[in-house]
Amino acid sequence: MRTWCYKLLIFASVLSLAMTGCFPGFPTGVQEVTASPQVEEVALPAPRLKGEMSLEETLAARRSVRQFTETELTLEEISQLLWAAQGITVAWGGRTAPSAGALYPLEVYVATADGLYHYVPQGHQAIVESRADLRDELWQAGLSQNAIREAPAVFVITAVYARTEKKYGERAERYVKLEAGHAAQNLLLQAVALGLGGVPIGAFYDDQVQSALSLPSDHEPLYLIPIGHLR
């Protein structure tokens, strides 16, 4: 009996260490990010966990919106939208959208008049990738859909398939695309809750989006989501 209890105690200890990331390869839901001294980071306001609309009201009000005013989004609004798409919600790294194996293959960017920002869920911050307004380039890549050029912010959801392939092989493509849909719906519902609107766009030239944003070669764009104030 004592031997059995001792073995159980050892197993529990090892499992606890693994879940806290002490053993490499164990899925903790946290992607490692190596900071560079040259990287310009933007601290985002803490996300709000209580809004003014119920989930049911948000679902009923959601519509695809393609026309926007020129009003820019506030940093608080951008912060809330990024958190809704991929924010961390529990200590071990779980996020707002479910992920197969907690491998989190998605990366979210947002293009505004002030530049291009890459969301880092760890620490809830954004990295400045460019100080250029790249929305016109995205508009051209997106088959000249006016919503892309008119919106004050265009969110770009990309996928790094290798993160999921290492565990799920050929099934990874399906799981990653399902996950992108989860994140996009979170983003769109959060927009409604903030009094904003948006539209998910899948019609674009992948290579042109990658080129416009100077994305890493393994970041495949899956969504362009223009968001702004309703006209």
Can you annotate each of these PLM segments?
Residues M1-L9:
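Bacterial N-terminal signal peptides that target proteins for export
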Residues C22-A151:
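N-terminal amphipathic, basic helical "cap/leader" segment at the start of enzyme domains
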Residues Q86, A113-G115, Q122, T158-A162, ...:
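Solvent-exposed coil/turn segments that connect beta secondary-structure elements
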Residues E150-P152, H219-E220:
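Short coil/turn connectors at secondary-structure junctions
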